[in-house]
Amino acid sequence: MNNQKTFKGLRLAALGLVAVAAFTAGCSDVSTELKTPVYKTKLTAEEIRNSAFKPEFPKQYASYERNDETTVMTEYKGSVPFNKNDNVNPLPEGYRHAQPYLKNLWLGYPFMYEYREARGHTYAIQDFLHIDRINRYAEKGGLPATCWNCKTPKMMEWVKESGDGFWAKDVNEFRDKIDMKDHTIGCATCHDPQTMELRITSVPLTDYLVSQGKDPKKLPRNEMRALVCGQCHVEYYFNGPTMGVNKKPVFPWAEGFDPADMYRYYDKHGDLQVKGFEGKFADWTHPASKTPMIKAQHPEYETWINGTHGAAGVTCADCHMSYTRSDDKKKISSHWWTSPMKDPEMRACRQCHSDKTPDYLKSRVLFTQKRTFDLLLAAQEVSVKAHEAVRLANEYQGAKAAGYDDLMIQAREMVRKGQFFWDYVSAENSVGFHNPAKALDTLAQSQQFSQKAIDLAMEATQYGIGKDLSGDIKTIVPPILKMNRKLQQDPEFMKTHKWFQYLPVLPKADQVWDGQKRLVSAKQ
């Protein structure tokens, strides 16, 4: 009898341990042992048209078409294409959570002309061809064909045809050689058309993976569920003519994914000849402070990878392509690439956080985003003040410190670093949520670097510029609300802000391009 009880007790204990283990496994890191679905489509290996995938996968395609939505905002983000520097006007022109100093900080760089909240991926080519960053007032756009890299799977054809010579071609050369809807970011960007296996089509990502000893065709599926997004949602730069293939895109990840890692990388991978910045990389020189600058691009992948979710194996697809049920109750991955915050039930989050209510989960996201956004505004103001301090010090006519030139080099270095650290978070599209600790730490460092620039400029002028930096920065350097290529052709407009004196007045010109339509002939 006692033996039977003992055996029964041991059996119950064993079952209990199994249950606990199963429960724990359900709450632990996401398994990377995902079974890969196997398909055999009727498509060719070269198929890139989005419409060709619709008959094969109508349910997924229907969800993909939801990327056409352009009216819904979350608290800080959304798909309404407002001007991201305009916190004065209401939607759709501006928005209360805009950053007013963007045009100041990007003065002299095409981003100063237009920078809007992105619409869905289905509009990638349409919005690209209408944006003012590309010169539409001349036959040539003034930017390399590299800019097409993350807009279309047609890149594969173009690179195959032209090889590495493709990258340095003018962006407008391909303006009318593409279907804005059928060739936009879509199925072929991430899937093999014949098997639907996830694949890497990005040249710079392939180059990086190979440099790390990885075969892009033999990666675990869970890793691929993030990397297909990491083809484009990343920081990148274009090679200079002396640094390899001219204008070829490169991911600056050789030293790591954090802003400090990238900043070290950029210090060694450029061809600048400016005193104090020799051999460093710069996207442009800010005309007000004369500082060689780096423009950060949307580093979502780098932000996510060592955050809470990235470290746990939770991928982009888990949150932004969560499972849904079609009308016939079939379970599919949604191809509406959007914020989980647009779902009142927060179902993407509750796949793991099933013990939390939707309201609680939203409140936690907003808690992080508010703290991040408040620091973004603070960091950009200190960055603007740093540019102004260096500008004033450049032109200071009073008695200067003995080490003036060296102090000014150091000041510009801190301007450059402070703005890059701010931009790393500003350009990243989660308002801090992909990695709250990294976002807040990066913005704190940004303010420290920018303040150091101010201190160095003050020291260089023996504090002679102090009186001109005293007071509210919005009064000292007003935010630039409007600036575009047409306005830069107007001499009177160019007198409306003191920083505009460092920009040339553009010659009068008619608009040549409206999307893919040529309006007038242009002389080169």
UniProtKB/Swiss-Prot annotation:
Which residues are recorded as binding heme 4? C316, C319, H320, H434
What membrane topology does the annotation report for this chain?
A: Peripheral membrane protein
Per the UniProt record, the site (Interaction with NrfH) maps to K59
Q: Which PROSITE patterns match?
A: MULTIHEME_CYTC
Q: Which residues bind heme 3?
A: H121, C229, C232, H233
GO CC terms, sorted = outer membrane-bounded periplasmic space; plasma membrane
Leader sequence segment: 1-24
Q: What is its EC number?
A: 1.7.2.2
Task: State the InterPro entries in the record.
Answer: Cyt_c552, Multihaem_cyt_sf
Question: Knockout: what is the outcome?
Answer: Sensitive to nitrite, but not to nitrate. Loss of anaerobical respiration of nitrite, but the mutant is still able to utilize nitrite as a nitrogen source for growth.
Tagged with keyword rRNA-binding: no
Q: What class of enzyme is it?
A: oxidoreductase
User: According to the record, what induces this protein's expression?
Assistant: Expression is induced in response to nitrite stress. Not induced by nitrate.
Residues that, per the record, bind Ca(2+) 2: E235, Y236, K295, Q297
Q: Name one GO biological process term.
A: anaerobic electron transport chain
Record-listed heme 5 binding positions: H309, C349, C352, H353
- Chain sites annotated for binding heme 2: C187, C190, H191, H335
Keyword list (alphabetical) reads: Calcium, Cell inner membrane, Cell membrane, Heme, Iron, Membrane, Metal-binding, Oxidoreductase, Signal, Stress response
Give residues annotated as binding heme 1: C147, C150, K151
Quaternary state and partners of this protein? Component of the NrfHA cytochrome c nitrite reductase complex composed of 4 NrfA catalytic subunits and 2 NrfH quinone-binding subunits. NrfA homodimer interacts with NrfH.
PANTHER family recorded = CYTOCHROME C-552, CYTOCHROME C-552 RESPIRATORY NITRITE REDUCTASE
Q: Which protein are we looking at? A: Cytochrome c nitrite reductase subunit NrfA
* Gene name tied to this protein: nrfA
